[in-house]
Amino acid sequence: FLETDNEGNGILRRRDIKNALYGFDIPLTPREFEKLWASYDTEGKGHITYQEFLQKLGVNYSPAVHRPCAEDYFNFMGHFTKPQQLQEEMKELQQSTEKAVAARDKLVDCYQDISKAFTKIDKSKTNYISICKMQKVLEECGCSLTEGELTNLLNSWGVSRHDNSINYLDFLRAVENSKSTGAQPKEKEESMPINFATLNPQEVVRKIQEVVESSQLALSTAFSALDKEDTGFVKSTEFGQVLKDFCHKLTDNQYHYFLRKLRIHLTPYINWKYFLQNFSCFLEETAEEWAEKMPKGPPPTSPKAMASRDILARLHKAVTSHYHAITQEFENFDTMKTNTISREEFRAVCNRNVQILTDEQFDRLWNEMPVNAKGRLKYPDFLSRFSSERAATPTATGDSAAAQRGSSVPDVSEGIRSALSLPNQELRPGSKPQSHPCTAASTTAIPGTPPLQNCDPIESRLRKRIQGCWRQLLKECKEKDVARQGDISASEFLALVEKFNLDISKEECQQLIIKYDLKNNGKFAYCDFIQSCVLLLKAKESSLMQRMKIQNAHKMKDSGAETSSFYSALLRIQPKIVHCWRPMRRTFKSYDEAGTGLLSVADFRTVLRQYSINLSEEEFFHILEYYDKTLSSNISYNDFLRAFLQ
């Protein structure tokens, strides 16, 4: 919770729920959000208590479990309406600061003894000593510190640790520096940067004001470098990083305290221009008024940014539809076989296949491309990025793009690494291997299941090539499959792709390996792969006046939005589901041990993977959105199958 009421109970407002959904990439239309909020705030108070919120989620409130941890108290992002709580916050921060200063003074006094003890204990002359031994030495020298206190002190001095060991020379140097800093004349001390680690809470805002006033130009330059479109806004995380660069040893706790004092701790974007122009006249008594005058909201999308996204979308579409032609053009330019082409050669390819670009448009596009140190385009990386299922978007779109996306497909290279590293698992209790050709070899349920993959475009291209050689391919797979498990290693599959000249990229191979790693053991299920390419399943033919229907809403307890992405996904997977819905239903039931007709999202995803259903993560999200409207994390598998059998 972000606020407390007069009785000290945590409360949540409409914006808090919206921020939470935004943070977890759960997209809701305004109408959907109003329905959700109405179901929580049944009395129309404009807020609900933390206990009421947990009760709506079916969770019993326990003060011991659901209160903020004491050690994370200052990181708890929120402001407090009770003065007593604010005083406690300031008192705790001041105490931790005083402890750090006292520990530093002790170390300075015992510097010679500590130095001799370290030299004596370092018999191998590596200059490194473990944390435990360091604590013991400090205790013997009269400077007893807990591991937490020692760690905080090391972090404040910038002394790093390696394998739980410290370079004691760095430690001694840091102690010496702190000693010399305290002994400097007053005139020189004023020229040194302010050490924020030693400040108490009341001084933080005033000292930051001094830094901002003395470094206006440098701060403006730093913020401008982040705000390339000159919108006046930067992310709060970027804003904090700039402040920490200028405010020597400003801690996270102090930064969050500073934001709360300025009443901008709940703002995802901060207007840095307003901050620099008006922070010198900030007074704590008028903080609310000062914060209200600051422009709100995320930076508006500039026409240039929109144009860049449009060009990237066109480029993605061109590469997807003319992959081989564009690849051939790149290879024709690459006469030295370096897997790179020049800037002008890339521009010529874009002009022929995408659109004729102005100098400004091409400069912005070139900045998004994978370029080597010599300024040449690495076209294999380019093809890998722009031929994937996801449309490529510039990284600058950031949080808003993530919120609109809802659920994105993880990077394929990361997905394949996680898939290949998963250990073998035993069969889930109550589940049995299915003998039907469409099923997987076993019904394993593993936490962290690899992402779903829509390999339909890849498999469609492969069908023509495999039709003439599938028997020989199957024979070689069986020869490599000595244990007769129905799968081979990923490297063996890649070797066969080369041998049979299947003409698919490494990226596409990795997608197939993820999809057909049906046992989550890093192996490639070749039987299911060959069957999918040889057994050509077509959708049921229907007249022009007919189309696939989703079951009526009154037959379902709760149904969600019927989006175009939802329909296109169901239409594509319909032939596969119709072909093997009976064994699939048996597998669903084996996971549904209680016989409720419902499966968890994780189990539902696992079964779809076992039957090699061509769905991307985004399409899977749309299906969940329809069949789990109440966000119960349970799917009615009978409702799902019924959609394909009417």
Swiss-Prot record:
InterPro entries given in the database record: EF-hand-dom_pair, EF_hand_DJBP, EF_hand_dom, EFCB6
Any Pfam family: EF-hand_7
Modified residues (Phosphothreonine): T29, T439, T449
Chief location category: nucleus
GO process annotations (BP): flagellated sperm motility
Region (Interaction with AR): 552-646
The protein's role, per its UniProt record: Negatively regulates the androgen receptor by recruiting histone deacetylase complex, and protein DJ-1 antagonizes this inhibition by abrogation of this complex. Microtubule inner protein (MIP) part of the dynein-decorated doublet microtubules (DMTs) in cilia axoneme, which is required for motile cilia beating.
PANTHER family: EF-HAND CALCIUM-BINDING DOMAIN-CONTAINING PROTEIN 6 (PTHR20875:SF2), EF-HAND CALCIUM-BINDING DOMAIN-CONTAINING PROTEIN 6-RELATED (PTHR20875)
Protein name according to UniProt: EF-hand calcium-binding domain-containing protein 6
Organism: Macaca fascicularis (Crab-eating macaque)
